[in-house]
Amino acid sequence: MEEFQRYIELDRSWQHNFFYPLIFQEYIYGFAYDHGLNKSILLENAGDKKYSLLIVKRLINRMYQQTHLIISANHSNQNDFFGHKHKKNLYYQIISEGFAVIVEIPFSLLLISSLEAKEKKIVKSHNLRSIHSIFPFFEDKFLHLNYVLEILIPYPIHLEILVQTLRYWVKDASSLHLLRFFLYEYRNWNSLITPQKSISIFSNQRLFLFLYNFYVCEYESIFVFLCNQSSHLRSTSFGALLERNYFYGKLEYLVKVKTNTKDFCVILWLFKDPFLHYVRYRGKSILASKGTSLLMHKWKYYLFNFWQCHFSLWSPPRRIYINRLSKHSLDFMGFFSSVRLNSSVVRSQMVENSFLIDNPIKKFDTIVRIIPLVGSLAKAKFCNVLGHPISKSVWTDLLDSDIIDRFGRICRNLSHYYSGSSRKKSLYRIKYILRLSCARTLARKHKSTVRAFLKRLGSEFLEEFFTEEEKVLSLILPRDSSISRGLYRGPFWYLDIICIHDLANDE
């Protein structure tokens, strides 16, 4: 965003969310396509103001004519690899990627101003950026709650509804018409939630991810507003980009549809709950409450009606589950999380009489989802579907040090991410698969046996699979000491992780 603030000089006619003229500035496409494409197709001497109307006009004409463009000799082989279908849509991709950059500008500027206004009120903490900060929150709050609502955010939303919602932010009709053209040209809305393992340079993921995030923001804006109004503890950390007139209009319409009354307090009374917590990561969200099952069914009914009335989106019942925390495990971010009771027996002696006191203690437990993780390892060709390690044949052409470094890096990343697991047995199995797969890969390369290869390398081979923390602990504390066992076996959350590690991305 800082790059845009240096380059973009908007005059007064552009400052009220009129961003259509930016489409004709060449550096927008340079920012959007700084990887993969040759920028020479967008470079032309367009004067001091860098307007390039002729270039964009040519791109639009070629897009309608469905002709083919050879970018340069350096990229010709790459284009042939993607084939005729991707060449056909190259011009659309160039303009859509530039438009994705442009449409993010008003939201980025409002977000920056919102954060600057809150700097004095909210203490900054880089640890809150970590996705692992969710689990300490679970450990602190979920022990006192009863029910949880597991929500899979429905999709796809109707494209026209999305454009109508976006027009309250982007008031330039020309830009909205162009957006509508992009959406109806590419109807791959279903691919938003499912991550793609390999995204080509001809995909418009940036535009669709922006639209999906905008859709989720619209859904959460009203949802969090109701939570704040119905809770005794108001949220101060939620920052949403809201257009207030439109926002309260939506609320009044929702009340009218649901209760046939103008009294807004009625709908707030239905969801009165002093202990309500909401967490979301990607397309899955969790709503936990200390209330009763009846209250959770009210929230479920509200969400169904909200999606249907506001987004014209019907959500199947199986996308929302109501579960009791004491009897159900949460499947969230690669962990099975649950609240279990640990019995603590205390012997009490009073004069001549003695008796036992059983004190049940609640504990938040997290377990690694071993079956999906083994499936990911099998898909990446580290083992078979049963979890038996196999050699990584595509890496046999690499140097021994590179092979060991790749396996060690994946093992350390997994250990880093799943270090918060309460039970390490599953994590040890994953480490075993990677170590033996590495040994078999090296043995296959040198046409030797695994036993002979491990005997030649010795303990130095295993050290590559240790994390830095494990290496330090092994030097400071003996492995069989009680303190060391507690550090190795207990959960430990790293607050520097901002995304889930992808096994397929081994580079």
From Swiss-Prot:
Its main location: plastid. It is found in: Plastid, Chloroplast. One of its GO terms (molecular function) is RNA binding. It holds the Pfam family MatK_N. Keywords: Chloroplast, mRNA processing, Plastid, RNA-binding, tRNA processing. One of its GO terms (biological process) is tRNA processing. One of its GO terms (cellular component) is chloroplast. It comes from the Eukaryota. InterPro entries: Domain_X, Maturase_MatK, Maturase_MatK_N. Usually encoded in the trnK tRNA gene intron. Probably assists in splicing its own and other chloroplast group II introns. HAMAP family: MatK. Belongs to the intron maturase 2 family. MatK subfamily. This is Maturase K. It comes from Browningia hertlingiana (Cactus).
